[in-house]
Amino acid sequence: MSMIPPERLARERVVSAEAVLDGRLDLRVYPYRHLVVTARRGWGHSGFQPLLEAVEHLCNYGWELVNITTIGDGHQLYAAIRRTA
C-alpha cells in the first residue's frame, strides 16, 4: 500500500480508518485543524472497531474525537476529529 499524498489529503480532508491503521499518511504536514476518518460497515462487522481504533491511534498524536455519524444508507461511518495541539 502506498502513502496518501499530502496534497490529496489536504484537498479531500477525508481518510479511511484502514489508511490510518496501516500508517499510510503523515499528518504532520496536514494544514487544517479538522479531519474526517471513515470506515465501511459490512456483513459480519460493524465498522466501529476499525474506526475507533484509528481515532484512538490519532489521539496519541494530538487529535480528539468530535462526533461519529452515518449519512445516507448507513453503510459508511464518519468520525470527525480535530487537532488539539
What are these regions (language model features)?
Residues M1-A85:
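Terminus-proximal functional modules
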